[in-house]
Amino acid sequence: MGGFFGTVSQQPCVADLFYGTDYQSHLGTRRGGMASFSSESGFYRSIHNLENTYFRTRFESELDRFVGNSGIGVISDTDAQPMLINCHLGRFAVVTV
C-alpha cells in the first residue's frame, strides 16, 4: 500500500508538501519521495529509503533545497518515486500508488 499528497498554490508550498506527505507515512515503510517545481529553477526531486527511519527524519535536513509553488510527495512500498517524465507535452513528476 502507499499514499501520495500533492499541492498547487500561488505561494510557496514546500511546508504543506512536507507535512502532507509525512501524514501518509502510516501507509508505507519502504520508500519516500518528494518533487517540487519552480518556474525559475525547474524540478527538484529527492527519494529516500524509509526502512530504518521516519520520513520526517530523512527529509527535514534537505527541506531548504525544495522551492516552488507546486509539488507532489509519495510514500511507497514498491518503487522509488516520484518519477520525472519527459514527453512531447513537457516534463512531469508522476507517482503511482
Q: Language-model features: where?
A:
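N-terminal glutamine amidotransferase
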Residues: 1-97
